[in-house]
A protein has these predicted regions:
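Nucleotidyltransferase catalytic core that binds NTPs
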Residues: 2-3, 10, 14-502
Length: 502
């Protein structure tokens, strides 16, 4: 689908299975946690501290049991009591304990103590590190509520600046002992990756799930910063999390830094638009501007507590060969980030899964902007045959939430009629449901659109750019054309200037 209708392309073959599957090399051999811990312990140049809060009390145990821990561990501590934890690291806003700021304060405090208490004169060859985590476990009453932060601050050589690798995890198994064991193993994997394989960020990511089940632990955010990772684009790390099956959705902000959904979306009004954005066109901007102006007028929407998301599905990132082109992804991300937008990469082909994802973090009003042709597909029963409750189950998820869909009109060509919710074809069997949603204003037309941009299709713009033909500049926002030209995005090649005649 194209233009205003391109933002929800999905087919029955693209349906996402409920069972999480990780994409790993079957030929790759992995070390056990004990082998990794012993390998670190036997390296006399590695020396550091461990600090663990909450469920995550198991990582350091692997190092003590592996043998040779006295060569590696300067200190291990567990700040289990909340008052003790606050006394050591300081209270967080909202008195939270399992959050990114708490983990960063732990890393800063513990690494600071290393520099304060260990003389570099006495340890001239030591590469110092600090491992920290803060974890809240799941329970049988709330089986998917567990989550936490795990991080490492480390040197790659003595006297070098430090590097940070931070991940966020969600826990899905209600068995607390299994959660503890899995977090312990993942902690060993992360520390081993940072200390041994820091030159290979891809291996750090791959090794996270060595001897850990995706059914128990989901990694939904990773961030690598520091001189050892100057060549790493954290947006590509986000993409890899979804591509590998580690998680189904990731966020990154206008600055290109990865975001954790529970921090970015918590209790917020959310307005999302799905598209390929290849590139961003005038029709995309018309959709978001007019949809936004309607959304902020809603009584239950707080303009100061609103998060706008530009969503790209993994399916929309695939090339004609079925692979994800990372350069093409970065081209799209660069434009969206330059426009000050937060980007969501997801594996949710169906809208009800996207709304269910948002509902983990907020009960406030949500809005989705879509082209009317996409709404036609939303009302196609074939996309819901895998559900026990069929289409009604999916719509129950969609519309039992506080959701409103803003429908942008479509016109296949400049000579054809404009299609809106009033003229959209609906199967007679589904017409009562459709009329109910229209009557209750859960489906609303965007009426203040620009009819002069309805003919713009992203694929048409992309074809013009790649063919080196003129005219595409008029189909994209003013700033975007210069960015495409200046950065040679989407395969743009400047037209050679004509040679001067002799």
């Amino acid at each position: 689908m194209r233009g205003a209708t391109e933002q929800a392309t999905f087919a029955p073959d693209d349906l996402v299975m409920d069972e999480p599957m990780i994409q790993q090399d079957p030929q790759r051999a992995s070390l056990s946690p004990a082998q990794k811990a012993r390998r670190i312990n036997m390296n006399t140049d590695l020396y550091g501290t461990f600090a663990e809060i909450g469920v995550g009390q198991e990582t350091v145990r692997h190092f003590f049991r592996a043998g040779g821990a006295s060569q590696t561990i300067a200190k291990a501590m567990s700040a289990y009591d909340k008052d003790f934890s606050n006394a050591i690291y300081g209270a967080e806003p909202g008195n939270r304990f399992v959050c990114e700021s708490r983990l960063r304060n732990m890393l800063k405090h513990e690494y600071g103590l290393i520099n304060e208490r260990l003389s570099r004169k006495d340890h001239p060859t030591k590469k110092f590190f600090t491992f920290a985590n803060t974890i809240a476990g799941s329970t049988f009453e709330r089986p998917h509520s567990g989550h936490g932060w795990i991080g490492v601050r480390f040197q790659t050589s003595p006297d070098e600046p430090t590097n940070d690798v931070i991940i966020h995890v969600r826990l899905h198994d209600p068995d607390i002992s299994l959660q503890q064991e899995s977090i312990g193993v993942m902690g060993v994997n992360l520390l081993h990756g940072c200390l041994i394989n820091h030159a290979d960020p891809d291996e750090i990511m791959t090794a996270l799930y060595d001897n850990v089940s995706r059914h128990v632990v989901e990694v939904d955010m990773i961030q690598m910063n520091g001189p050892a990772f100057n060549h790493v684009d954290n947006r590509l790390l986000s993409l890899q999390l979804v591509k590998r099956g580690y998680t189904d959705a990731v966020l990154f902000g206008p600055d290109g830094q990865n975001l954790q959904a529970s921090e970015a979306l918590y209790r917020k009004n959310i307005l999302a638009i799905r598209g390929s954005f290849r590139p961003v066109t005038k029709v995309n901007i018309d959709m978001i501007m007019n949809g936004y102006n309607m959304f902020i007028k809603e009584q239950r929407v707080d303009r100061q507590n609103l998060q706008v998301l530009f969503e790209i599905t993994l399916n929309n990132l695939r090339s004609d060969t079925g692979d994800v082109d990372e350069k093409d992804f970065i081209d799209r991300a660069d434009i969206l980030c330059s426009l000050g937008q937060t980007v969501l990469i997801s594996n949710y082909q169906e809208y009800y899964k996207l709304v269910e994802y948002f509902s983990r973090y907020t009960k406030a009003r949500m809005g989705v902007i879509m082209g009317v042709n996409n709404l036609v597909e939303v009302f196609d029963e074939k996309y819901y045959r895998h559900l026990n409750g069929g289409m009604l189950e999916a719509f129950g998820i969609l519309f039992t939430r506080d959701l409103k869909i803003y429908v942008y009109p479509s016109r296949a060509s400049i000579n054809e009629d404009i299609m809106t919710t009033e003229t959209m074809p609906v199967h007679p069997r589904l017409k009562p449901l459709y009329d109910y949603l229209l009557f209750n204003k859960r489906l609303v037309d965007i009426n203040s659109y620009d009819p002069n941009v309805l003919h713009i299709f992203s694929k048409q713009v992309l074809d013009l750019i790649r063919a080196g033909k003129p005219g595409w500049e008029d189909l994209v926002p003013p700033y975007v054309d210069n960015m495409i030209k200046d950065n040679r995005l989407f395969g743009y090649v400047p037209t050679p200037a004509p040679k001067a005649s002799a």
